[in-house]
Amino acid sequence: MATGTPAAELRELSEDELVTRLRESKEELFNLRFQMATGQMDNNRRLRTVRHEIARIYTVLRERELGLAVGPDAGDAA
């Protein structure tokens, strides 16, 4: 079963790492959509998994923006 990264694991990453993961996931989603359009797709479930992972990353970034959650670097500053 294809599973994405749990939100708890994403919350442990720095903002730069999250942005990098987001970029990589978007590239993968683009490639998967291209494979789907050309009929080369083997695992249709992977599309959904990658979309959900992108949503999780956006959620973690938004939580930090609103101050609902703090990143791993913020605890060291106190």
From Swiss-Prot:
Keyword Ribonucleoprotein included in the entry's annotation = yes
Which superkingdom? Bacteria
One Pfam family cited in the UniProt record for this chain = Ribosomal_L29
InterPro entries given in the database record: Ribosomal_protein_uL29 (IPR050063), Ribosomal_uL29 (IPR001854), Ribosomal_uL29_CS (IPR018254), Ribosomal_uL29_sf (IPR036049)
Which molecular function term from Gene Ontology is one that the record holds?
structural constituent of ribosome
UniProt xrefs under PANTHER family: 60S RIBOSOMAL PROTEIN L35/50S RIBOSOMAL PROTEIN L29, LARGE RIBOSOMAL SUBUNIT PROTEIN UL29C
Descriptive protein name: Large ribosomal subunit protein uL29
Gene name on record? rpmC
